[in-house]
């Protein structure tokens, strides 16, 4: 009998897949002592004496029989019995030299070595492993399972960290696809009567959905696996901001109308939102897409039944300005006394009313979509207020009435001009006003040519808006440099021209008084009093942060906001959302006005300009005309001026300890 070549495990062989034709290699985890290799067999001698002796004691000679297979080496245990039976049942027939494996045999671990020499099986040896070896094999198997499970959990946790959300990339791609399908299904089930409207609505909604998808993708992709403070986070989030802002610009430019207005609102929040958004969306403050004269003609036919040339003399075909909701044409109007004057004709974009509600629904959907992936972004409630405001702006008759009311409130002010309305040429979608020549308030070069004193102009400008907020409680709520022109009065004083009166907000009397006290206390750096009135206004536990959003001191607004972000960390957006959501809606528009005032203050290089408004807020506290109220006003104003001078003196002597008005910011 030829020498029996056997392969024996040191402590048992676990989970090794048998090879049928050639055994050419073995796993690195099994310790073999290689003594001899021929062209057909792999032979090794195990040094485990206990197992070797056991084999010698239990030899079982098998009859010689021709086989059609190569040597088979395996371990019978509960993990590979079924695998072995499945793989080898039909190989080599049912030769008696193959060790039978009972299906239910899981109580003992056995090893079978089937050895072949020159296509003849010489022996087959079956043995039972010692108990300690068997236990070690089973223990090793269990440890392997535990390690595999632990690795799997670590991989899942790593994937979750990379996604930055409960949603994986696959998840939000699925949501995007389902959103498109849902939108298409709705249009199929309930299509508009006019097929053109179907195409328009479908395309506009797809643009919104696509923009929302891109914005979400940019942030998920560039911030994947990064947390605030990590290396590369600042650089990557700037890239994401820039790309997301471009996606918004593309969307607003394509959909026009309401979307341009939303872009203007976003561009005005420059002390809250990233500068990448502000720079990109500011283009819509002055340059919005306009419609052709043919569209204007159609609107005139619908509104008046006439052609523009039948109503005006020399109606210019190209608009001199285009905004979010309308464009302005210059024309000449012949009055009843045959006087010919220049007028500005504001024409609403055709179809805007029909698109209004659909566009608001689309914006609501995309904000909800973004909120799924960024839970801290909870600003969709703003759309409700925006919807109310925009419905007012779309009514030009309402705008005309607002302008006349504003003129009455400032009837004694010789340095404020409001264009006259020509009612006979005005409808809900066409507004005809006096044309006034002037220079934009942010045009420094133009103001210098006029010889305007910038400090005097700033005090005029801030006082007019302070009176609207603190005294009259009737606020022009769409202020931006394009709506403010400057010209000279006959005596050389600056004359402020206020345009676009479509959106005004009536401020509740109690809100107005509380806001007056809040502003005064912020100017004095009185943290306790300012927090008291901020709570009354609805800021709640975040009352101490409201002053930062008001940014009374432009030179400190960015620094104060950075301090707030450091304190709140990743909760900054959540806190801002809670403050804005719970404040009276009038205050939201006050914040927008404050942004403009801050911009002009910075542009003109005015220091402590907020103090001028503080004096007006004191006047708002004492609005009565009786002698007692007037005495209280002058006494309070005198005390206020003294306090400001004392604080300013201390600030100059000890600048690190006292700041105006950010003295309260160390409480944040």
Curated annotation (Swiss-Prot):
CDD domains: ADCK1-like. Residues 314-668 form the Protein kinase domain. It comes from the Eukaryota. Pfam families: ABC1. Its EC number is 2.7.11.-. The active site is at 478 (proton acceptor). Residues 88-111, 132-162 are annotated as: Disordered. GO terms for molecular function: ATP binding; protein serine/threonine kinase activity. Keywords: ATP-binding, Coiled coil, Kinase, Nucleotide-binding, Serine/threonine-protein kinase, Transferase. ATP binds at residues 320-328, 346. Residues 138-162 have a biased composition (Basic and acidic residues). Residues 131-163 form a coiled coil. Residues 91-105 have a biased composition (Polar residues). PANTHER family: ABC1 FAMILY PROTEIN (PTHR43173), SERINE_THREONINE-PROTEIN KINASE ABKB-RELATED (PTHR43173:SF41). Belongs to the protein kinase superfamily. ADCK protein kinase family. This is Probable serine/threonine-protein kinase abkB. It comes from Dictyostelium discoideum (Social amoeba).
